[in-house]
Amino acid sequence: MERYESLFAQLKERKEGAFVPFVTLGDPGIEQSLKIIDTLIEAGADALELGIPFSDPLADGPTIQNATLRAFAAGVTPAQCFEMLALIRQKHPTIPIGLLMYANLVFNKGIDEFYAQCEKVGVDSVLVADVPVEESAPFRQAALCHNVAPIFICPPNADDDLLRQIASYGRGYTYLLSRAGVTGAENRAALPLNHLVAKLKEYNAAPPLQGFGISAPDQVKAAIDAGAAGAISGSAIVKIIEQHINEPEKMLAALKVFVQPMKAATRS
């Protein structure tokens, strides 16, 4: 959890926002997935948002569903994902690592056991995509017991009550949704979100990172100009993996070419 605080403090000092890529663990296979994550970090990623493959991903558009299917085809299990997380943490001791997942995967393990395992491998935050704030108590309590930040999604139509709850219960960062619907780079982020950012700040919420539909440097810059602490990009990155699925080296080179200008756009 503290890794987010240190990161945001360092970025503030350098007058930069955070660029955070999302990928599915084990896509397109364990070995290449680990190389992808190393490449994203080398190219400038400030933190990681990682998915554990799940059979019924509600909030994901087709791009990320395909990533999940590729990981399944490679035989990737949740247990192997945790082994990967331990390796990533060993290699990159300071980068914040967040998980984006679904409640069933948490229930399968048992809520407390799941967060204990997160703590053990060095995961900093968990966003459970299909658990609304009002049902989050058992998740967020277990998370805090194990020094894992519970992350909440702030939708574009959030009312005052919801903003206060998010500010009160969330730690690490706040996932600021560009728009309603499923993930996907085709659906460009609708800005500005200034009013939400201002309210979150007023209620002392964890720093907002804007996600959903972030696929170009100008969107990263716009998110930061609107007051967000940074931007999360998922579908655009996963699409690059898909496009170069049979050319692992080209894939890594293309990811680097995508991430560098995205990170550059966070510098004011």
From Swiss-Prot:
Role played: The alpha subunit is responsible for the aldol cleavage of indoleglycerol phosphate to indole and glyceraldehyde 3-phosphate.
| Residues at the active site | E49, D60
Q: Which family does it belong to?
A: Belongs to the TrpA family.
| Organism for this UniProt entry | Shigella flexneri serotype 5b (strain 8401)
Protein name as annotated: Tryptophan synthase alpha chain
| Quaternary assembly | Tetramer of two alpha and two beta chains.
User: Does this UniProt record's set of keywords contain Thylakoid?
Assistant: no
| Catalytic activity, reaction form | (1S,2R)-1-C-(indol-3-yl)glycerol 3-phosphate + L-serine = D-glyceraldehyde 3-phosphate + L-tryptophan + H2O
Q: Name one GO cellular component term.
A: cytosol
Any one GO MF annotation of this record: tryptophan synthase activity
List the keywords (alphabetical): Amino-acid biosynthesis, Aromatic amino acid biosynthesis, Lyase, Tryptophan biosynthesis
Q: Is Ligase included in the keywords of this UniProt record? A: no
